[in-house]
């Protein structure tokens, strides 16, 4: 049975991915920081949960030595594009330095494992109409936000690990996705509101009744 490790397992994607992989017969483990969401995993008997930070290299080494994954999904990140303007340092630290820690630990302790880091459509920036639909082989990466820059850097770093060390790397660039457990502040409703203005208030006629 293949062993899977998911970083950022308590996020929206991580939760559903873990459940899907478990149903397909994989042994699943994941890591996340000490948040209330971590209790979701502790209550699930089919998960092994490691609590810690991808910035902690010693923690990562202990996880890899303990679990020895065959497949790694790297989802842990500062994952909000717009908010990256208010958290540039955190975005670059987690998404670049943290990712480098994950790649290096995987290279050292599970060199034959496949690693799938979550890249992003934010790496493209604004795409001219004449380049739509996007072709991942020819559309240039021109990120315009700290988040987009951090993800482009992470992707190039992953390619470097593949080219220089022969690591098995798959690089999906994820576009906007919504679903159960998505944080309310990131829903399509909020995006619609930002695009078209606030929702009209509902006006009612007050009626008094005597019972």
Outline where the language-model segments fall.
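Active-site segment of SDR-like NAD(P)-dependent oxidoreductases
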Residues: 10, 78-82, 120-125, 131, ...
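A conserved pocket-lining segment of Rossmann-fold NAD(P)-dependent short-chain dehydrogenase/reductase
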Residues: 84, 138-142, 169-184, 190-211
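Conserved glycine-rich Rossmann-like NAD(P)H-binding loop of the short-chain dehydrogenase/reductase
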Residues: 26-35
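NAD(P)H-binding glycine-rich loop region in Rossmannoid oxidoreductase-like domains
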Residues: 54-94
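N-terminal Rossmann NAD(P)H-binding glycine-rich loop of SDR-like oxidoreductase domains
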Residues: 4-24
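SDR active-site strand-loop-helix element
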Residues: 7, 31, 72-78, 115-121, ...
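Rossmann-fold cofactor-recognition segment
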Residues: 45-55
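Catalytic helix-loop patch of NAD(P)-dependent Rossmann-fold dehydrogenases
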Residues: 86-101, 114, 123-171, 182-186
């Amino acid at each position: 049975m293949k062993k899977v490790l998911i970083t950022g397992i308590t996020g929206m994607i991580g939760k559903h991915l873990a459940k899907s992989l478990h149903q397909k017969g994989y042994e699943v483990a994941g890591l996340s920081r000490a948040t209330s969401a971590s209790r979701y995993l502790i209550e699930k008997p089919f998960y092994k949960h490691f609590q810690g930070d991808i910035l902690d290299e010693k923690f990562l080494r202990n996880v890899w030595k303990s679990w020895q994954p065959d497949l790694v999904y790297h989802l842990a990140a500062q994952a909000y594009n717009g908010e990256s303007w208010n958290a540039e340092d955190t975005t670059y630290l987690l998404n670049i330095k943290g990712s480098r820690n994950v790649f290096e630990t995987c290279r050292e302790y599970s060199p034959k494992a496949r690693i799938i880091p979550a890249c992003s459509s934010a790496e493209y920036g604004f795409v001219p109409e004449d380049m739509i639909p996007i072709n991942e082989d020819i559309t240039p990466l021109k990120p315009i936000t700290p988040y987009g820059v951090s993800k482009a850097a992470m992707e190039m770093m992953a390619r470097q690990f593949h080219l220089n060390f022969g690591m098995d790397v798959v690089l999906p660039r994820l576009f906007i996705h919504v679903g159960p457990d998505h944080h309310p502040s990131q829903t399509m409703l909020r995006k619609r509101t930002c695009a078209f203005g606030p929702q009209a208030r509902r006006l009612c006629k007050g009626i008094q009744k005597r019972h």
